[in-house]
Amino acid sequence: MPIRKSNDTLFYLFGTIPVIWLALLLAQSLGGGLPELLRNLTAALEQPTNIIWTDKSLPTILICLAAYGMAVLLYRTNQGRTRDGEEHGSAAWATPASVNAQFAQKESIPLTQHVRLGLDTHKHRRSLNVLVIGGSGAAKTRSFVLPNILTANTNYVITDPKSEVLLATGGYLKEQGYDVRVLNLVNLEQSDGYNPFRYLRDEKDVLKLVNNLIQSTTPKGSHESDPFWTKAETALLQAIILMLFQEAPEYEQNFSMVMRVLEYAEVREEDEGHVSPLDLLFESIERRKPDSVAVRQYKVFKLAAGKTAKSILVSTAVRLAPFNLPQIQALTDHDDMDLYTLGEKKVALYAVIPDNDNTLNFLVSLLYAQAFQALYYSADQIHHGPLPRHVRFVLDEFAAMPLPGFTRELATMRSRSISASVIIQNMAQIKELYKDSWETIPGNCDTILYLGGNESSTHKYVSEMLGKATIDTKTHGQTKGKSGSYSTNFQMSGRELLTPDEVRKLDNRYALLFIRGASPVMDEKYDLMHHPAISHSSLGGAAPYIHHGTKPPIYTGRPLLRVGGTENPNPLKGEFH
């Protein structure tokens, strides 16, 4: 629009030249009546270059320019009230080639078969956040996830349902020099270790961990009539984890130890004054550190009466029940994730989750929350700016995992060289997850890729994003009888580029692409089998990648909780120090 306005101004300025020329011819023709003026003007037009300056030339020029200016002003005023050809909308399709020319760079991410988005966000001024929408069978993995990972030009944190992506791409990333790390909740024996305690720098991080743990283990859509129980569990967990963080040796800072400490929290309903082994431990800490935050939070828990305290303990133990499983204890007793290096060197972190069970998915939620914290810390406190390597979160099956605070991170990650590809089946999923704030997700994704689906609210959403175009319509009318007549009328009306029904019937070979500030594109989905690196993938003939997790190290040191004798059958009578 500013370019068009500039061109119009030049056009009107050039229009003053013929106006001045006509004014000079008119000035030398003035004199006598109207018939003489017409004869003189006709003679002057026969010799248009023979101009004579008279005393009437300047006033005539000024009068003609004033009239010309008023005419232009009147025309522009009327034009400002209309948009020819856009009365009902100006939406139009862009060609894949034109959009690719605007946004593609040497280092880019593939979006469709013919459109790429460059990694240098300062050039095109768009974030790399992508919202991918596609129902089952819409080729979300084959046309988006796998091509992007095989491009291997950023670091990756990947949600991988069923281990399909790890098998197909892990080997190639290894060849490209990536450090491949895996949290495998499908085959726990093939998982690297992840211990959330390793990323606690101070007491504030402990509070974040407990808050994320509570939110991640709360069933989706549950509504508590009384938040007392959740708050009481929170206080107890804060006390125990703070105590381990401040007092225990490194090898006892894990959730296995949290479960063991919970066993020492003995409560007797009939004896309110009963002192449990855990009470004794916190009393000993209070004598040495009267201002301990752990002790203060434990006192909050102890405000509950005997029966209530027992219910809190049971509820907390049930919430943390997965940490009683030997496989989960082995996985969380040590750490191989090294989250602080995610943006420092070539790293690909896979979070393999089952697609038919979400029991352990809270571990991935904790991992991602701490990954964001570690990356933000590295960018803000170490590099004081963007990370050395761009980190992309490829969040397949996004709705399967609660990510507390994700909308806030999505809005702030760009300046730190972090981006997210949020992959959902339909808009109803994020509406259910984020209720009143769901629009912040598409609002912070400068690119939206629609691959197809069969959910009606998504069809309507996509149709509205496409917008309306102004089209010509033709109507026919006919009256019969002796004085019958037939008429044809032409008029303009508005029409969506695609109606919701047409969005539903979109050919499965095609995708709709929206990049902020550009017209929408309909293009073929990316053909994985034509990717330059497909021969290095298991889908192109290479061997599937099998990850072998590390074994937990053997720790030595003085334990926080020590049993008095090796033959003592009752650890509750052990010695605290």
Where are the predicted features?
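Intrinsically disordered, low-complexity regions
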Residues: 32-33, 81, 86, 90, ...
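P-loop NTPase motor domains
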Residues: 126-418, 433, 501-525, 530-533, ...
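Conserved ATP-driven motor cores of ASCE-family P-loop NTPases powering translocation/secretion/packaging/pilus
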Residues: 410-412, 416-512
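Basic- and hydrophobic-enriched, low-structure N-terminal and domain-boundary segments
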Residues: 1-138, 142-145, 189, 468, ...
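General secondary-structure edge motif
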Residues: 89-91, 112, 124, 128-129, ...
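A broad, low-specificity signal for short, low-complexity segments enriched in glycine/proline
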Residues: 89-97, 106-107, 112-122, 142-143, ...
